[in-house]
């Protein structure tokens, strides 16, 4: 039998955060993670419901960089339900959070939309920072 991995990029929207402002974490969560629609939620909770009903486990690639803006509690709110339901969490990284982070940017003056916008040493530093945030949020 062929092994199949169901993977889901799981992230707060940096664009929505820029439009609504950094104080709108709850709304960004509802729209980006829960994916609330008039017909109900279609985000991570719904995706896990469907997978659980079919005996399938998913791999959720979680972007922890919003911790620069909201702290690791915002990431734990994403990671904990995934792990509690027996699914896997792995690292996903959007460097555009560096711009939103302002003074909390660990690479002062450096911003970019993609990892290739950074030097190799900066990429390594970003991955290390993101890994630490993800682990602080409860990922193994």
Q: Positions of the model-derived regions?
A:
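Catalytic alpha-helical scaffold of carbohydrate-active enzymes acting on polysaccharides/glycoconjugates
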Residues: 1-140
